[in-house]
Amino acid sequence: MWTWDIILALLAVGSAAGFIAGLFGVGGGTLVVPVVLWTLQLQGISSHPYAQHLAIGTSFAVMVFTTFSSMYAQHKKSAIDWQTVRRMTPSMIFGVLIGAVTAKYMPTRALQIFFISFLTLVALKTLTDSKPKASRHLPALPGLSAVGTLFGAASSWVGIGGGSLSVPFLMYCNFPAHRAIGTSSGLAWPIALAGTIGYLVTGWNVPDLPHGSGGFLYLPAVAILSIATIIFAPIGVKTAHKLPARQLKISFGIMLLLIAIKMAWNLVR
């Protein structure tokens, strides 16, 4: 049963997810997935065998709107390296589609442990201002395609837009913080779109999904969350471009660490 409390909570989370997406070039999935699961619980359907798939698919659908809003705002700031986006997008879409098809077969716990470890390492390197070698640049197309496929698949399995992976990678390749975040927003939109299509198709014929679902997309939550994210993503972008690069980089490292702590807490509780 939908109540004003649920709707207002979704709007609040959508606002926060949109702002964070714009600020850090991510998709906001780390906030959206838990709140969708909470919404399903209030509807009495959290025990559905595909509840997690519904949450991830819904997260991707919301990110389609969030990341487009963020990407457009970053483009107006001339902060996106479109050549890098064009080179990485095909492999990332391929990885997302692989992830969507194989999600139900993945050892979720092992994947989450690996992801938590990776985020913690990257966060600590970012916070300690570990600088890459000046000679380090993006790899050639074969290497970039391998990275893109891996990032796309991981994004699909965990339900994120990929910014938690692509921003550190781009900064590791000597992209300035603002440029890395802007370019990541350009990469996040095709990931979100591919993930949405993947979860829509793979869940289309699954029986007994909640009323209002389209495949593994819970459409009422998509509509409410997207309204807020579209509004607040450009605000996050404007805020990011007002911050010094060092402060933005530290803030991003703190965000990664908080995501890792949250995921670890969910594993052990």
List where the protein language model places each region.
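Transmembrane-embedded, aromatic-rich helix segments that form part
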Residues: L165
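Hydrophobic alpha-helical transmembrane segments of multi-pass integral membrane proteins
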Residues: G182-L200
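Conserved, well-structured core segments that form the ligand-binding/active-site neighborhood
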Residues: I160
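Juxtamembrane transmembrane-helix boundary motif
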Residues: M1-F24, L31-H53, T58, T67-W157, ...
